[in-house]
Amino acid sequence: MVLIRVLANLLILQLSYAQKSSELVIGGDECNINEHPFLVLVYYDDYQCGGTLLNEEWVLTAAHCNGKDMEIYLGVHSKKVPNKDVQRRVPKEKFFCDSSKTYTKWNKDIMLIRLDRPVRKSAHIAPLSLPSSPPSVGSVCRIMGWGSITPVEVTFPDVPYCANINLLDDVECKPGYPELLPEYKTLCAGILEGGIDTCGFDSGAPLISNGQFQGIVSWGGDPCAQPREPGVYTNVFDHLDWIKGIIAGNTDVTCPP
């Protein structure tokens, strides 16, 4: 009965978002069902985001994914045929940089969510560790998410799509984004020739470099996957002290300047 209810919810929500979105992983292929046990599907208001399971009680996503009536699904691959171990949670607490729900489009787009109850690990649900070192420019990065697989006309897959892109130097990003300042705690990643990218409803999903969780999908060009307009990601490594402090119960910890 629980699985039937989850299936019904996912199908209804998918139809709702198909009318409102035109964005997500562009230029990818279906993810292997076993490669994303940490990837969560976040629904709120009339929108969809991704997120990353850090441990049995915590999810990391983008601040602009905050909204009312938030539902968090874990263990999802196909929306039409959910895995038997799909679990649903709602937020117990939300934490933002500078103890504020406000954020700029360009910086500090990060939100920690404490779940209402612990998640049970299973075949399709497992956390992704925080990074132990910063990412290297030029490294291959893995992106993933549900949503439109075409940049203009909406084409939503039932399963998450994955793709490989490269971590770029900030200098390579600057021509497309003059508003991107050196002091921002962000990463720039993509393909300068275009054709592969994350997009709007992929917000909050992870950027994985050399097996480490290094970025959170934040913003980019419109339409997605255009030449010299790569994606911009919140830098997870730069926020480690804040993330670890909040999880440890230190709510007075501050974000990096």
Curated annotation (Swiss-Prot):
List the signal peptide residues: 1-18
The record's subcellular locations are: Secreted
- Alphabetically list the UniProt keywords: Disulfide bond, Hemostasis impairing toxin, Hydrolase, Protease, Secreted, Serine protease, Signal, Toxin, Zymogen
| Keyword hit for Repressor | no
Q: Where is the Peptidase S1 domain?
A: 25-248
Q: List the disulfide bonds.
A: C31-C162, C49-C65, C97-C255, C173-C188, C199-C224
Q: Which residues form the propeptide?
A: 19-24
Q: Does the keyword Membrane apply?
A: no
SUPFAM superfamilies reported in the protein's UniProt record: Trypsin-like serine proteases
List this protein's GO terms for biological process.
Answer: proteolysis
Subunit record text = Monomer.
Q: Which family does it belong to?
A: Belongs to the peptidase S1 family. Snake venom subfamily.
Quote the protein name from its UniProt record: Snake venom serine protease Dav-KN
Taxonomic lineage: Eukaryota, Metazoa, Chordata, Craniata, Vertebrata
